[in-house]
Structures are given as structure tokens and as C-alpha cells.
Amino acid sequence: TGKILITADQINFGYTSSCLWKSPLNIQVRSGDRIHITGNNGSGKTTLVKLLLGELKPAAGTITRADFSYLYIDQECSVLDPGLTVFEQTERFNASHLAEHELKSILNRYLFPYETWDKPCFCLSGGEKIRLLFCCLMIGNNAPDVFILDEPTNNLDIQSVEIITAAIKSYRGTVLLISHDHY
């Protein structure tokens, strides 16, 4: 088992005077954990993640956090710059200074053929954005300690789901996956 990143003890939260969860929550997140947070709309999945990251304060209980880096990937993939083209986006993440042909090879692996390289990112579908983001993170080779993925497979076809699933499986850090799905 890995280093303890977050310990939440008897936490609860309320936007009003009532608490969000019927019973207080106890959670421990360790380095390398794969945690799948499921629930219906309004059940508090995103609120829980915001509490764990320190973006919200609990109404009850305590949360202790180690020092770690994280990347929250929302459904809009707002980490991407919508004004750049697909290829320009990969160049932006190219901290390893890969050659142009290597970038193009990686783009192809993530289902971005030549004819998509000049496409502006604001024109991409939700599935294309998440694929491009994972492609860029592979190119950047500077993954955070924790990935938080909010509904990463929404609007994806089966081939895209397989690519994203493989990328998540190959990632060695901690993954917090928020979804309605029980997969």
C-alpha cells in the first residue's frame, strides 16, 4: 500500500442546515489507489471530491492532506486551450521535446489522423477532447500524483472508451473516478 494522501474522518457537508449524507463519511486515499465514486445526480459525488481536495470545508469531521499534485479533468476538458488546433495543443504539452513525427505518431494512436491536426479544439466533440487530453498528458510525461476524472466516458464510442481505459490503467498514480456508471 502506498503513502497516505488524504484521510477524511467523520466528514459531512451541507449547503443548507441539513447534511448531504445520512451518515458521516470516512475515507482514506493512498498513492496508487483506484477509487470509483458512483451515485445519482445530486448525491454529492463532486462535492465529496471538492472536500477531499480542500476546495470546500466540511460541516463536520476533519480532513488531513499530504502534499501532492492533482489534475481535475472535468467533462468539458477545460485544461485544453479551445483556441489551439489539435496539433498545436500537443506542441503545448511537449515538455519532453519530442520530434514532430513522434507527436504525429502519438496523435494517430489516439485516433487523430492527419486530417484532424489543423482542427480547432473548440470544434472537437466531448469524446475527441478527452482523447486529446490523454494524448497530451502522454506527450507531456509529467503526470500529477492524482487524476480526478469526472464522467470521463460520457459521449464516447467504444473505441474511445478502450483507449481511455488503457491510458488510465497504464497510469501509476492515484485515480478518483466520478461517474453514474458502475463499470
How does the language model describe each region?
Residues 2-183:
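ABC ATP-binding cassette signature C-motif
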